Structure formats: C-alpha cells, structure tokens
C-alpha cells in the first residue's frame, strides 16, 4: 500500500482517511522500509497534509499507544455544550517547534488547571527546537519520568495530574525515528503527538507552530472526539496564545469549530516583548516554573494566566476567559498550584 500511496501523493493526490490508516498501519507495524517512510512523509509534507490524512494517522497512533486508564471526573461548572456525564481529562500538549525560545508555558498551565480540580493528562516529550521540552523541565523540577503506566494512572487519579512521556507510550513510533531524523524536516509526525494522548483526553488546548495548522488541527480534534478545546498560534510564532500581539484561536465546541483573533488587551493584560517570555535550559526553566507557581509577577505570569484562562474554559471550570484568568491567579496565589507540583514530584519518586 505504501508504494501506491507514495505514487499518489507525489502527484498531489489526497488520500482518504481509510487509506491513510492502511499506510500508517504498515509504517507502525514495521512493514515499510526506512526509504519508503522517508519518501512518504516528505511527499506528504510537500503536498500538504489534509484533515482526513492527519485524522487517519492519529487514529493508528492512538490504537497502537500503551493506554493510560483514568477514572471519571465531574466538571465544576455546568456548560450547555459539555456533557457532564462523560469523563473530563485535559491535555495541554502542543506541537513545539516554534523556534521562539519560550519557557514551558503549557506545562506550567497544567499544574494550575489541575489545582482547580480538573484531571490533567499532560502528554509530552523532550525538546523539539528549543533547549527544553516538557519532559526536560519536569525532570529538572524533580519529577521521575521513568515510571510505569500504573504509576501515571495512580498519579492522575490521586492528585489530578500525571505526565505521559511519549517515547514510553508510543513504542510503534520506533520505526519512523530513523527516517525522521535523517531527513531533518518537519513532517506529519511533528503534529501527531498532541493528537494522540494515551489517556484519551477529551478537552485540549493545543498550540501549533504554524498558523495554517490552527483550523486544520481543530477539525482533526473534532473528528477524533474532542468535546471542547482550543487550537492556538501566536503571530510571533509561539505555539501558545501570546502576549506580544495577536493570536489565532480555533474553538472546538459541540456545534463545530469557530476561528477568531485575540489580543492580550481584550482580557486586560499588558503586552510584552518576546524577550520577556524567553526561557533557557532545563534548569533555568525549572526556576521560572517555580517562580510563577510561587506567585512571582511579570510577563511570564501573565502569559501563563492567559493560557490557563483558555484551558479553564475548555474544561468548563470557567464561563469565559476573563473568569478563567481570575481563577488561575487565585489558584497560584493560594499556593495550590505549587502544591500540585510538589505532590507530583513526591508520588513519582515514591514509585521507585
């Protein structure tokens, strides 16, 4: 199948979701050669991946992931577009690869949202383009990444947050590692991670490194069963809602996908230059995360509050972003968010 798929994609013909599933099954089962994998993902990148193609690939990755089973939780605020009888799990995993050298914003957000009573299954990996990915900063903060799926499940169930280390849960990806590394360009695999949470997160805030991916990945998440969420991109290139200027936001609701542009001023937040949002290596970013969770003021706190505000809307904990920002600020200042970090560090290290 992959040889036929390569020939079609080279001719700029789109594959159906079913055809993409067949190709990715071949890739992830070891049935395709490294040359075939490299040729296929390069041709796909040049053509441009469609919603159906990304959806099909994500379904295969989800099916082959080691599952993380999480018990049911109940939302704190009744929103008409969210079914309270269903499980609510949030992921704040983004694509990375923004090249803006920002600190770990979505990881910081995860602790705040979990302290608000939302179960968070934070999916992540080591650095893509920066010097510090979510796994790197969590390790520097003292979180033990080398734990069993059962420990991750217990962590989410008992304290409301767990880290899903992608390499440990997506073993079938090993067949694509070599070709991806050797061709050295962004491909469909750079956007699949946030779409394939092994805990089946049904609420997401997903940051992307290209504006044209915003609506596309929102449509993919909708097809994959996401009940509520946002796909976001900053005009400065950040895979977050930025403080430097305008951001593109796609909201996912029961009614579909709605695209909008937002600025910090809409929420009473002062803009900041990108330099004030820069991070560093894992140890430096760990200091930044601790500072924010300890209540330190400044641009880094503001961008975390803004993104946390959206996450709290996605999960139904806030009626709007302004309320979400207020709740996030209160949660930090009460010490509850820092407590979540301390509990995650303790639980993952007890498991050794």
UniProtKB/Swiss-Prot annotation:
It comes from the Bacteria. Mg(2+) 1 binds at residues 106, 240. One of its GO terms (biological process) is L-tryptophan biosynthetic process. This is Anthranilate phosphoribosyltransferase. It comes from Geobacter sp. (strain M21). Catalyzes the transfer of the phosphoribosyl group of 5-phosphorylribose-1-pyrophosphate (PRPP) to anthranilate to yield N-(5'-phosphoribosyl)-anthranilate (PRA). Binds 2 magnesium ions per monomer. One of its GO terms (molecular function) is magnesium ion binding. Anthranilate 1 binds at residues 94, 125. Mg(2+) 2 binds at residues 239-240. InterPro entries: Anthranilate_Pribosyl_Tfrase, Glycosyl_Trfase_fam3, Glycosyl_Trfase_fam3_N_dom, Glycosyl_Trfase_fam3_N_dom_sf, Nuc_phospho_transferase. Homodimer. Its cofactor is Mg(2+). SUPFAM superfamilies: Nucleoside phosphorylase/phosphoribosyltransferase catalytic domain, Nucleoside phosphorylase/phosphoribosyltransferase N-terminal domain. Anthranilate 2 binds at residue 180. NCBIfam families: trpD. Pathway: Amino-acid biosynthesis; L-tryptophan biosynthesis; L-tryptophan from chorismate: step 2/5. The gene is trpD.
């Amino acid at each position: 199948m992959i040889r036929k798929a390569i020939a079609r994609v080279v001719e700029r013909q789109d594959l159906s979701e079913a055809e993409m599933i067949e190709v990715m099954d071949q890739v992830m089962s070891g049935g395709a050669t490294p040359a075939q994998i490299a040729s296929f993902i390069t041709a796909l990148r040049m053509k441009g991946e469609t919603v159906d193609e990304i959806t099909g690939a994500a379904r295969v990755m989800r099916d082959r992931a080691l599952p993380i089973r999480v018990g049911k939780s109940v939302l704190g605020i009744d929103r008409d577009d969210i079914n309270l009888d269903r499980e609510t799990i949030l992921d704040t995993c983004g694509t990375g690869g923004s090249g803006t050298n920002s600190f770990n914003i979505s990881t910081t957000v995860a602790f705040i949202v979990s302290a608000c009573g939302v179960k968070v299954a934070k999916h992540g990996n080591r650095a893509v383009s920066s010097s510090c990915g979510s796994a790197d900063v969590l390790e520097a903060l003292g979180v033990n990444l080398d734990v069993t799926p059962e420990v991750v499940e217990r962590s989410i169930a008992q304290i409301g947050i767990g880290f899903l280390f992608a390499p440990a849960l997506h073993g079938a990806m090993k067949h694509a590692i070599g070709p991806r590394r050797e061709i050295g360009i962004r491909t469909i695999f750079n956007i699949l991670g946030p779409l394939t949470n092994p805990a089946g997160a049904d609420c997401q805030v997903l940051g992307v490194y290209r504006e044209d991916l915003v609506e596309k990945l929102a449509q993919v998440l909708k097809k994959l069963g996401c009940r509520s969420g946002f796909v976001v991109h900053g005009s400065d290139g950040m895979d977050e809602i930025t403080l430097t200027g305008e951001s593109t936001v796609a909201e996912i609701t029961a009614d579909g996908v709605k695209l909008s542009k937002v600025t910090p001023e809409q929420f009473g937040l002062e803009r900041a230059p990108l330099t004030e949002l820069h991070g560093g290596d894992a140890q430096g970013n760990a200091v930044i995360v601790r500072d924010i969770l300890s209540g330190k003021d400044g641009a880094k706190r503001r961008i975390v509050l803004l993104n946390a505000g959206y996450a709290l809307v996605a999960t139904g904990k806030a009626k709007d972003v302004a309320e979400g920002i207020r709740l996030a600020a209160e949660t930090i200042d009460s010490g509850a968010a820092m407590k979540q970090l301390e509990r995650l560090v303790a639980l993952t290290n007890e498991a050794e």
